[in-house]
């Protein structure tokens, strides 16, 4: 429940309020209205809902439909002239975040907040942190792969970072479930569209940066992408940063007056004696660690999570146990065929993460390598060139290009775009299950490997704007072992 006076106070304090327009009359103050719910979905309103008219695709007919369900008030950046009062604001997304925060009782003040950003590794790092903090605390987690608000039930999120109303609703549920910490993945999109506006994190972690999410409906340039990633540093009380990432010098200057830990080859917090399933650390995490996720980049994610959790009350023993216990669905899952050949299933879905995945596999598997890969339709278009240029440097890999959430595009047209940057022959098979079957058929020795990249644990294909059923890469591969 929230009073209209409270709504207006919040908006005025942040410089967001313009006026209320009611039947052509302008008001600066208003009283005697109470809202029992808030919503940005016009299908989920009642007469006591405060509705937020947001989004580039918002249409007046959504409002008209909501009014037929009894809607009496809305917030917008303009007057849609639909016969009910409107609170006009300068920025609807900022307004929605601040009002949601208050409506749900400021749950951020009752939890320790840990956020991860980076082009890749956010989910893995979040899982490490969740397992570490679970040793001695009661964490909740908002993750692309799995979200849990009670530590017992898990569900998949539609967005890396939820819309602000959903975010504060979930944070409030975590508080009601007696959680002590909240671990989040924070995307650049979350800052671009202000889903976390007004939030300050106890610890913010920057894992890495490489060009991604650049396209017509995402970021217009790398500069814009990197800028929105860096906003997490501004909004965190303490920060953890990978000193080996590109453009580290900018971040180092940006956070010099904040509490911080740097990890990587330039500082005390380093990885030593890196092996497939173990490593040693120096600095604040000095000691020996067991790890189930192979690859140096996963060890880096573990160190980042460990340093963050150390600041949030975890002991070194908690960190060791948590890292050793961590597995992530669809992240470096390994199957073995009857003939001994390995199958690696991973969510790698941009050029940089695919490069690291290939390097890890080729370190351990020295025989024939087959790769099953697609690229998403209608988003991240720059990935296609990145994939093609990378694979052009690996003529030893037999590439099978296929569908990966083609959406409104033709998967074979996407495959053609990727292959236009590759100077050696590749296979193109539209059906992803058939592509996996074909790749596994050519690997028949214990040193051979199939890499199935892109979808990870996703059990759907996005086709024509809808999630169509798909068994999942692991289930498909298991059929052909």
From Swiss-Prot:
Gene Ontology annotations for the cellular component aspect, listed alphabetically: cytoplasm
Motif (L-lysine recognition motif): 404-407
Protein residues bound to UDP-N-acetyl-alpha-D-muramoyl-L-alanyl-D-glutamate: 42, 160-161, 187, 195
EC number of the protein: 6.3.2.7
Pfam families the UniProt entry points to: Mur_ligase_C (PF02875), Mur_ligase_M (PF08245)
Subcellular location: Cytoplasm
Residues modified as N6-carboxylysine: 229
Post-translational modification note: Carboxylation is probably crucial for Mg(2+) binding and, consequently, for the gamma-phosphate positioning of ATP.
UniProt xrefs under SUPFAM superfamilies: MurD-like peptide ligases, catalytic domain (SSF53623), MurD-like peptide ligases, peptide-binding domain (SSF53244), MurE/MurF N-terminal domain (SSF63418)
Associated pathway: Cell wall biogenesis; peptidoglycan biosynthesis
UniProt keyword terms in alphabetical order: ATP-binding, Cell cycle, Cell division, Cell shape, Cell wall biogenesis/degradation, Cytoplasm, Ligase, Nucleotide-binding, Peptidoglycan synthesis
HAMAP family reported for this sequence: MurE
PANTHER family, A to Z: MUR LIGASE FAMILY MEMBER, UDP-N-ACETYLMURAMOYL-L-ALANYL-D-GLUTAMATE--2,6-DIAMINOPIMELATE LIGASE MURE HOMOLOG, CHLOROPLASTIC
The family this protein is said to belong to: Belongs to the MurCDEF family. MurE subfamily.
Job of this protein: Catalyzes the addition of L-lysine to the nucleotide precursor UDP-N-acetylmuramoyl-L-alanyl-D-glutamate (UMAG) in the biosynthesis of bacterial cell-wall peptidoglycan.
Entry protein name: UDP-N-acetylmuramoyl-L-alanyl-D-glutamate--L-lysine ligase
Organism: Streptococcus pneumoniae serotype 4 (strain ATCC BAA-334 / TIGR4)
Gene assigned in the entry: murE
